[in-house]
Amino acid sequence: MNNILVEIGIENYIYLCVVLFCIGIFGVLYRRNAIIMFMSIEIMLNAVNLLFVAFSTFHQDAQGQVFVFFSMAVAAAEVAVGLAILVSIYRNLSSIDIDNLKNLKG
């Protein structure tokens, strides 16, 4: 595994993670669909996880990989709760457009 990282280089992993994170930010800021925004947040989380794994492999330390394992478990719970909330919103409003959420009474 270390040979692959040396051949590719840590800089390329950093560039890839920055590009993925920027795609996620773009999706959150410029899209109004809740599912697209939710997927964009997951892309941002995966970019950070990839960076953790790349740095932990580069420094030959497993702590970053262990952190990513727990982060993925939390992300799975986040996906379950987030999709349940989106399904509930769709049932009430028949739309998942973020602009329609201001019509909800709390």
Curated annotation (Swiss-Prot):
User: What UniProt keywords apply to this chain's record, in alphabetical order?
Assistant: Cell inner membrane, Cell membrane, Membrane, NAD, Quinone, Translocase, Transmembrane, Transmembrane helix, Transport
Q: A GO biological process this protein is involved in?
A: ATP synthesis coupled electron transport
Q: Does the keyword rRNA-binding apply?
A: no
Q: What is its main location?
A: membrane
Q: List the InterPro entries hit by this protein, alphabetically.
A: NADH_UbQ_OxRdtase_chain4L/K, NUOK/Mnh_C1-like
User: What are the transmembrane regions?
Assistant: 8-28, 35-55, 66-86
Please state what the protein is called. NADH-quinone oxidoreductase subunit K
Species of origin: Flavobacterium psychrophilum (strain ATCC 49511 / DSM 21280 / CIP 103535 / JIP02/86)
Gene that encodes the chain? nuoK
